[in-house]
């Protein structure tokens, strides 16, 4: 366990950040969470956050002792400066530059900047996010180089010694499910399966084998593929 100060987890209510929350609870003495309301089309993920926080502490008494307050920040300004399929009712497609139109420019940069400011006030040294390069859509602000550079910038600009952790950076979705199993067994896997939301279209009515979602958007396809590979690996 890491003992120097605590951690602030960027917790959206999705699979990746939920796994990162468990990862942080397993390592730090104090863990707080922060979520961002930026007018996302799949805002149902925000509605999953409180219930997930309440249920994850039931899995481990030590985690219950470590989980601290939750913070939710209004970032509706993101919807004013960008027009994407995550903030507009638009069909998901590739842009002319090859990026999907679900990319919200600057989103993670803004998330981490505000999280670092909040963490400084809360005296939390460690920032934890669920970004990864392995199963991703080419988002520039999910890259390892971007986040390492951002850590330097945040420390220079805020005068802190924050550490940015991205425990999923080199994991694919199957390995992310596997990490959840290592951290909390099948109970945590099932909690993430049923208690988080990933679908870009905000479909939280249909419970699939791998969780809620439409099953056809890029986020659902990645989650479904990872789930199938994870379960297949258990049968080998």
UniProtKB/Swiss-Prot annotation:
Cofactor: Zn(2+)
Residues binding ATP: 11-21
Gene Ontology molecular function: ATP binding; ligase activity, forming carbon-nitrogen bonds; zinc ion binding
Pathway noted in the entry: Purine metabolism; 7-cyano-7-deazaguanine biosynthesis
Sites where the protein binds Zn(2+): 199, 214, 217, 220
Swiss-Prot/TrEMBL GO biological process terms: queuosine biosynthetic process
Alphabetical UniProt keywords: ATP-binding, Ligase, Metal-binding, Nucleotide-binding, Queuosine biosynthesis, Zinc
Pfam families: QueC
Its job: Catalyzes the ATP-dependent conversion of 7-carboxy-7-deazaguanine (CDG) to 7-cyano-7-deazaguanine (preQ(0)).
Protein name according to UniProt: 7-cyano-7-deazaguanine synthase 2
Organism of provenance: Sphingopyxis alaskensis (strain DSM 13593 / LMG 18877 / RB2256)
Gene: queC2
């Amino acid at each position: 366990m890491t003992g120097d100060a605590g951690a602030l987890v960027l917790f959206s209510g999705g699979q990746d950040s939920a796994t990162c929350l468990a990862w942080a609870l397993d390592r730090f003495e104090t863990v707080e969470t922060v979520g961002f309301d930026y007018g996302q089309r799949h805002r149902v993920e925000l509605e999953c956050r409180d219930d997930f926080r309440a249920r994850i502490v039931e899995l481990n008494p030590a985690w219950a002792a470590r989980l601290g307050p939750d913070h939710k920040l209004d970032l509706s300004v993101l919807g004013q400066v960008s027009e994407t399929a995550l903030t507009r009712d638009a069909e998901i497609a590739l842009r002319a530059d090859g990026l999907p139109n679900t990319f919200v420019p600057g989103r993670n940069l803004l998330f981490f900047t505000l999280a670092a400011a909040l963490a400084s006030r809360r005296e939390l040294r460690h920032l934890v996010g669920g970004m990864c390069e392995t199963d991703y859509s080419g988002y520039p602000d999910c890259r390892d180089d971007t986040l390492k550079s951002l850590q330097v910038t945040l420390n220079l600009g805020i005068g802190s010694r924050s550490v940015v952790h991205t425990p999923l950076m080199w994991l694919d979705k199957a390995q992310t499910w596997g990490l959840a199993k290592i951290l909390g067994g099948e109970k945590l896997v099932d909690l993430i399966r049923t208690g988080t939301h990933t679908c870009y279209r905000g479909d939280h009515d249909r419970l699939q084998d791998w969780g809620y979602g439409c099953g056809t958007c890029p986020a659902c396809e990645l989650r479904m593929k990872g789930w199938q590979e994870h379960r297949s690996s258990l049968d080998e």
